[in-house]
């Protein structure tokens, strides 16, 4: 049976675009509060007098107010007594999760300092490879800016970022559930309630990005990861665009063709509505086994996206059919989600009528698939061609010039959650002595090509405000049952039963007919 080809995904590829598979990454850059100077001699003397009063029947320790305690700032520097130096040696390599032209992604265990013993994914990128291509530098910059700004239950977290002379290291949360793509590969297609769950969580992540003025532009199964419970985590922010608010458009041609909105292909100017088209294309992929418009090559695929009818299988419910038609409208202005309500418009559709949005955001809704994991280190949801390799981080034998390294200024990061976990270990009850302050493929996504070399890592509004051209409108027609081609398999596609949580191992490929997915979209096994 022919099967899907793995497309650009999360852990399986550290390089940014033209590669076998692609992983998530994000780079933070925050300025940690600097520790205050050491206490003065007067303060130390005062502390000495306090101890002396205790020794001679003075006030008891629990009679002191907080005014007798010295306050100090919790920061990476202060809690680690002059800071914990995050470096490659802080992590033990466990498995290879992915490999690409720019480096590797490892499963690692932290062996020193805060988070000792915890499992992470470590993405290693070669600086020399990144700086050779302005587009790849732009991808890194976009991910850094966005993941610095957004924190959401359905968006991936980055814990640490650091660098050596020739490499960048990104320490990410380990998402042991693997890619949503792998679930589609196993099941062939999803039942509507399964698709509804994933689409609902994804819509909340997209809505959060849009509130921040960010459009995603590369929604596809490979960029959606699952955590150990089976909840969605949106990854890979290299093609995002910032500062896109109401009335603002951008003209960059980028994305993955099969999921790209018509206005991107026509270069007529686009806004956040492109993400709702992509959600519709993803929904169609989940329910039918392939994106809505595919061709033998990119040109034919683009022609179909711009001109062809939307064929809807007869087994889809009326709610699913209606949502697909409203999301896959070629006229962006009339597309569901394009209005001021954004994600709220999509979430109010009857297809999501059974979703409790508050419980979903709190991750209290049980996912349809819960990964069967044996331990925290389980890598069964990742490609064995990587995980069976011996993990080796090659020597850092290359360095950049001082001017080239300027691109990576502000790279180092420690997540606030790490500082909070350390802060909890400190008691703020009054002490006898006040605490002292410490001293010191055809599926290759199309990348954006706009990049200002002098911009580097700084933030700022860069959105184009040019008036969009008026796009040529082709009517979107939908087919009836008579247009369904069922001759190849002798039967029409239909939803399949799926494994319920905790009811047994995952099924293997279950699609009952020859896959409708084009050869270049299938996994090579």
From Swiss-Prot:
Residues 381-399 have a biased composition (Polar residues). Widely expressed. It comes from the Eukaryota. Residues 91-352 form the Protein kinase domain. Coiled coil: none annotated. ATP binds at residues 97-105, 123. InterPro entries: AGC-kinase_C, Kinase-like_dom_sf, Pkinase_C, Prot_kinase_dom, Protein_kinase_ATP_BS, Ribosomal_S6_kinase, Ser/Thr_kinase_AS. Serine/threonine-protein kinase that acts downstream of mTOR signaling in response to growth factors and nutrients to promote cell proliferation, cell growth and cell cycle progression. Regulates protein synthesis through phosphorylation of EIF4B, RPS6 and EEF2K, and contributes to cell survival by repressing the pro-apoptotic function of BAD. Under conditions of nutrient depletion, the inactive form associates with the EIF3 translation initiation complex. This is Ribosomal protein S6 kinase beta-1. It comes from Homo sapiens (Human). The lineage of its organism: Eukaryota, Metazoa, Chordata, Craniata, Vertebrata.
């Amino acid at each position: 049976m022919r099967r899907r080809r793995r497309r650009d995904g999360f852990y399986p590829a550290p390089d940014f675009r033209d590669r076998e598979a692609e992983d998530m990454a994000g780079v933070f850059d925050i300025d940690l509060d600097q520790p205050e100077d050491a206490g003065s001699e007067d303060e130390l003397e005062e502390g000495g007098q306090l101890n002396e009063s205790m020794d001679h029947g003075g006030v008891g320790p629990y009679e002191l107010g907080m005014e007798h305690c010295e306050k100090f700032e919790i920061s990476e520097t202060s809690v680690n007594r002059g800071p914990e130096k995050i470096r490659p040696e802080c992590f033990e390599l466990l498995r290879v999760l992915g490999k690409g032209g720019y480096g590797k992604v490892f499963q690692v265990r932290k062996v020193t300092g805060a988070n000792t013993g915890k499992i992470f994914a470590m993405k290693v990128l070669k600086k020399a490879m990144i700086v050779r291509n302005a587009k790849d530098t732009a991808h890194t910059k976009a991910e850094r800016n966005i993941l610095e700004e957004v924190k959401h239950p359905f968006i991936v977290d980055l814990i640490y970022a650091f660098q050596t002379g020739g490499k960048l290291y990104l320490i990410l949360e380990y998402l042991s559930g693997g890619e949503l793509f792998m679930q589609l590969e196993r099941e062939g297609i999803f039942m509507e309630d399964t698709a509804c769950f994933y689409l609902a969580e994804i819509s909340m992540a997209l809505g959060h990005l849009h509130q921040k003025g960010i459009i995603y532009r590369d929604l596809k199964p490979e960029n959606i990861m699952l955590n150990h419970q089976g909840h969605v985590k949106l990854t890979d922010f290299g093609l995002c665009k910032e500062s896109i608010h109401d009335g603002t458009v951008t003209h960059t041609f980028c994305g993955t063709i099969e999921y790209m909105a018509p206005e991107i292909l026509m270069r007529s100017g686009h806004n956040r509505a492109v993400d709702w088209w992509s959600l519709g294309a993803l929904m169609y992929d989940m329910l039918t086994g392939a994106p809505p418009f595919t061709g033998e090559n990119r040109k034919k695929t683009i022609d179909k996206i711009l001109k062809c009818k939307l064929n809807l299988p007869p087994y889809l419910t009326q709610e699913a059919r209606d949502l697909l038609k409203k999301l896959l409208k070629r006229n962006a202005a009339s597309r569901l989600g394009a209005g001021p309500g954004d994600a709220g418009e999509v979430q109010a559709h009857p297809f999501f009528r059974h979703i409790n949005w508050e419980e979903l955001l709190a991750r209290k809704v049980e996912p349809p698939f819960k990964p069967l994991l044996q331990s925290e280190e389980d890598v069964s949801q990742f490609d064995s061609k990587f995980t069976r390799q011996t993990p080796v981080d090659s020597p850092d034998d290359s360095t950049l010039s001082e001017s080239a390294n300027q691109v990576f200024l502000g790279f180092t990061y420690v997540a606030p959650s790490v500082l909070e976990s350390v802060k909890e270990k400190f008691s703020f009850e009054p002490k006898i002595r006040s605490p002292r302050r410490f001293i010191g493929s055809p599926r290759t996504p199309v990348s954006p090509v706009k990049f200002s070399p002098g911009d580097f890592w700084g933030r700022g509004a860069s959105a184009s405000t040019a008036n969009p051209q008026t796009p040529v409108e082709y009517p979107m027609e939908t087919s009836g049952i008579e247009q369904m081609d069922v001759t190849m398999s002798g039967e029409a596609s239909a939803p399949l039963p799926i494994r319920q949580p905790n009811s047994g191992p995952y099924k293997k490929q279950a699609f009952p007919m020859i896959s409708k997915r084009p050869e270049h979209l299938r996994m090579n096994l």
